[in-house]
Design a protein with these regions (language model features):
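Structured loop/turn residues at beta-strand edges in well-structured enzyme cores
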Residues: 6, 63-64, 182
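Active-site phosphate-binding/coordination module
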Residues: 28-152
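Mg2+-dependent phosphoryl-transfer enzymes with acidic/Ser/Thr/Gly-rich catalytic loops
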Residues: 2-10, 26-28, 39, 205, ...
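Short alpha-helical
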Residues: 25, 53-54, 195, 228
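Asp-based phosphoryl-transfer active-site loop
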Residues: 7-23, 118
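Flexible loop residues that form catalytic
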Residues: 16, 73, 192
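Conserved acidic, metal-coordinating active-site core of Asp-based
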Residues: 125-128, 132-233
Length: 233
């Protein structure tokens, strides 16, 4: 007899290169497939390395979206009845949008001293640095300038995100870290080329108590040890 499998209850989807096409959009075919799954009672759960603020509104508007795994599994959010408003709540220009309050169901933060040590390595790279904290995508003016220059190179959809308010621009990232090292979900550095990223990897691996991965050959992502999307699921 053919083996019977239990009905699918949940579909977890990465964003870049999976749910999103190369232009950073959800295709009509994908949208229709998701709607068919939702009609059968299946949960659709985006699982991404991005923070909540960087979940595209186009994704938050998809049918069935309520729960989302962010920062490689460092945070799991319940977006409630207004997923788009929950995402906008983490924008720097949140007052310009209708917002709602998301609930964090799981938070696996970096230990304070670990976050400080990892941040010091990030700073020494003099590259495009992103700090993810409480759903916010924090960066600085130098990093935004590097990101703008890189956008023309058609890097990954994550690296080419528009600055539409989803980024919180810090005047001084080091000073901010001195006050908020206790609340770090993830640190992410985008380099100019894969060789620079590969050269930096050993220094990140040397930091005790971290998980180090690469979402693309040009970046390095750091979270607390043990954090991954599978554990979050």
């Amino acid at each position: 007899m053919p083996q019977e499998f239990p009905a699918i209850r949940l579909v977890a989807l990465d964003l870049d290169g999976t749910l999103l096409n190369r232009e950073g959009h959800v295709t009509p075919r994908t949208r229709a497939a998701l709607q068919a799954a939702v009609d059968k009672g299946v949960y659709i759960v985006p699982a991404t390395g991005r923070p909540l603020a960087s979940l595209p509104p186009e994704v938050a508007q998809l049918p069935g979206i309520r729960y989302v795994i962010t920062c490689n599994g460092a945070a799991v959010w319940d977006l409630g009845a207004d997923p788009v408003g929950a995402v906008y709540s983490r924008y720097s220009n949140a007052k310009e949008h209708r917002t709602s309050t998301p609930v964090c169901l799981l938070h696996s933060l970096m230990p304070v001293e670990t976050a400080r040590e990892a941040f010091a390595v990030c700073e020494s790279c003099h590259a495009d640095l992103r700090i993810f904290s409480d759903g916010y995508a924090c960066t600085d003016a130098h990093s935004i300038a590097l990101a703008a220059a890189r956008a023309a190179q058609k890097d990954s959809t994550e690296a080419r995100q528009p600055n539409d308010g989803r980024f919180t621009i810090l005047r001084d990232a080091a000073e901010w870290m001195s006050r908020n090292a206790f609340a770090i979900e993830k640190l992410c550095v985008f380099f100019e080329d894969p060789q620079q990223a590969a050269a930096a990897l050993p220094r990140f691996y040397a930091v005790p108590g971290v998980e180090v991965v690469q979402g693309s050959p040009k970046n390095v992502e750091v979270t607390a040890a043990g954090v991954d999307k599978g554990e979050a699921l």
